[in-house]
Amino acid sequence: MTTYKPYGMTELQSLLQQAAEQKLPVLTRHQHSAGLGIDFQNWNKIREIDTVNLTVTAERAVTFGELEEAVNEKGLHVAMMTEDLRAVNLGDFFAEQMYCLTSLHYNQPRLQILGLEVLLADGTVLQVAGKTVKNVTGYDMCRFYISNREQLAIPLAVTIKLVSLEAVQTMLEAYIADEAVLVKLAARLRQQNITPQVCLYWNKAAAELLQQAEPAGRLIMVCNGSKQRLEKDLQAISAIADELQIGLQLCEQPEQVWYEIKMLRTHTVWGDGVKVPSLRCDGMLRLLAKQQIACWYNPLQGSLQLIPAQADGVLYRQLCSEAEALGGVGNWYYMYQYGFAAAGETKIWQRLKQKFDAGQRLNPLTEGGAEHGAE
């Protein structure tokens, strides 16, 4: 694969034209396929921080760390940012649909995107939506373009809704061996309307992957807010932990925790691999423990990030079946690659691809293909 680093729109559009003439796939990520690769490292500017509308517009190569540092100076915060994402750029985050640790607290990342500049397969540049929050009538093209893993269009710049920078933050940790306790914890937190900024659990297999010699899985909770609000939430969480006999305590090494989460991201094979109702996740966790499959997830959400020792379509299909038996679902992106996605959804996808990328060249997916160890 030949990789180019265009400096401007004219050069970028010329590359797409070249790919079309030579009938080469256009690859925007680090695939090992033959084709024309585009490295967007020169799309690295923060175009605007709007303190009136509370938005920031930045190009795709800007990292979360750079973005957060810039908006912090204005007393603002990028809600989807957590320390494990500091070196991740915006383009990779959305192209790979990375798991957002704060989505339950602040909303899903795609709902925090107010505007987009996207490049279509034919070289057309579109400006989609804008700075203000509004209800959408008809198709929401902003969410459509940000959610397709760069299969239909390439986001070049995003406008993100910001929130006020919280003054106080506390990290708590505990070790939990009984999966049923996690379900009870999620239920009690919901009953008291407590949503930590981050609530994350990784199982014993994931701990072993991180070379942690712990007897059980690890629970991490990050709470933020004003001092008064934080004290109230911590008292309620402490009472719940005592009730469930969870040895919850202040985390003394938060930097190490963020590093470990970063490592879990690096090892993850099936991001949002399966989704199971949070109150039935114990069944899925027991199955994963039996097969020694590492996983991490938010106990309040039920979207599991999976790290199998060997990824293949047979195993993924089995896990999807187990998730469905618990009222959950698999991930269409992986099901398509492993060749067992629903026919109706596959047909819709193929029609969208034909409409937006008739040459089938933008980061092409192959049904039953080899990506992620597919058969």
What are these regions (language model features)?
Residues Q31-S33, T51, E214-A216, Y297-L304, ...:
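Short Gly/Ser/Thr- and Asp/Glu-enriched loop/turn motifs at secondary-structure junctions
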Residues M9, Q22-L24, D39-Q41, E68, ...:
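Conserved glycine-rich FAD pyrophosphate-binding loop
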Residues H32-R47, A58-R60, S103-D122, I154-A157, ...:
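Structural signature of FAD isoalloxazine-binding scaffolds in flavoprotein oxidoreductases
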Residues T28, C199-W202, C295-P299:
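Short beta-strand
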Residues A34-K45, V71-L76, E96-Y106, T132-T137, ...:
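A glycine- and small-aliphatic-rich helix-loop capping segment at beta-alpha/alpha-beta transitions
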Residues L54-L119, Q127:
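A generic, well-ordered mixed alpha/beta core segment in the N-terminal half of proteins
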Residues T2-M80, G328:
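Glycine-rich N-terminal segment of FAD-binding domains in flavoprotein oxidoreductases
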Residues A95, L114-T266:
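C-terminal substrate-binding/cap subdomain adjacent to the FAD-binding core in PCMH-type
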